[in-house]
Each structure stands twice: as structure tokens, then as C-alpha cells.
Amino acid sequence: MTQVRETVSFKAGDVILYPGVPGPRDRAYRVLEGLVRLEAVDEEGNALTLRLVRPGGFFGEEALFGQERIYFAEAATDVRLEPLPENPDPELLKDLAQHLSQGLAEAYRRIERLATQRLKNRMAAALLELSETPLAHEEEGKVVLKATHDELAAAVGCVRETVTKVIGELAREGYIRSG
């Protein structure tokens, strides 16, 4: 007999989890479809994208260990999620541990990129990364990415106005088209 999994869905832009706020949705999730953005926001409202969670990935795992959350989890696209049980089985825990290990390696790479690379290089890397997510699609042989300048600023650790300037430079140099 096949076990039926509980799933929940959110529309693009919906906040799934809030920092430090326990509630009925304060659970760990596996992404089945779509893309979830994890963002930290400072007192001035500046956001930093900590991680993009793709299908098969997990987020909210601190709920399994009673830890406070420091980020918002937002549906970057329409998403379908599987809430994890409070007491996951060993196979699920193994998948979660592997995901956490990969997430830690990704975090190290992002920290290294933020600390050592010029903004234009960080922007190019972010655009390439986003081009491989559900935020992008192919149209007439070209990758079309749907992302705001605010979202790009959060991805590379700068303000929107700077993103606008760098996007303009990349467009003038012929690397991208913006519009």
C-alpha cells in the first residue's frame, strides 16, 4: 500500500515561515515543486538571500531541533511542499543530513564569493545560478529570467540602485539584455 503524503501549496510571494515566530506552519519542509527563497532582513529592510531551495531540498529544519529561525522563507514561485513529520524515520534523516551538508558547502561558497569577488562577478554568478531555477525559462533559444532588481540585490548583498547600475554595465558590454 502506498503511503499518501501530506502536501501544502503556496503562491509566489507568500511568506511560508517567519523568523523566530513559532506557529502552526513552524515545521521543516521538503520542496516538491517550485522554488523557495530564504532571506534575512536587517532593521533597515535590506534583504540578503541566504539560500534558494529547489525541488528535493529541505528548509525549516531548525523546527525539528527547537531552534529559533533567523530568516524568512518565501515562495519565489508557486510551490508545493511536503511538511516533515516531527519524528522523521532514519532514511528521511539521512536525506536531511545530506541536504544540510550540501547547504553548508553552498553557504561557504556564498560567503567566499561575498568576501572576495567584485560585485559585477557576483552579479554574473547570481544570474547564472538563477538561470538554472524555476525563475527562468527558455524563449527563442535564450534564457529569460524573471527577477526584480530588489531580488538580485538580495542575492548579491547590495542595494537595488547598485544592481541597476551593474545590470546596465552588463547590458552595455553585451553579456545580457535587460528589459
Please name every model-derived segment.
Residues 132-179:
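Phosphate-/nucleic-acid-contacting segments
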Residues 77-86:
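A short hydrophobic beta-strand segment most commonly corresponding to one strand
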Residues 8-10, 50-53, 84:
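Hydrophobic residues at beta-strand termini and immediately following loops
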Residues 62, 77, 122-124, 162, ...:
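Long cytosolic regulatory regions associated with cyclic-nucleotide signaling
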Residues 126-130:
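Short amphipathic alpha-helical elements of helix-turn-helix/winged-helix folds
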Residues 86-124:
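A small-molecule sensor/coupling module
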Residues 1-14:
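Short proline/glycine- and basic residue-enriched helix-capping loop/turn segments at helix->loop/beta transitions
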Residues 14-78:
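Cyclic nucleotide-binding regulatory domains
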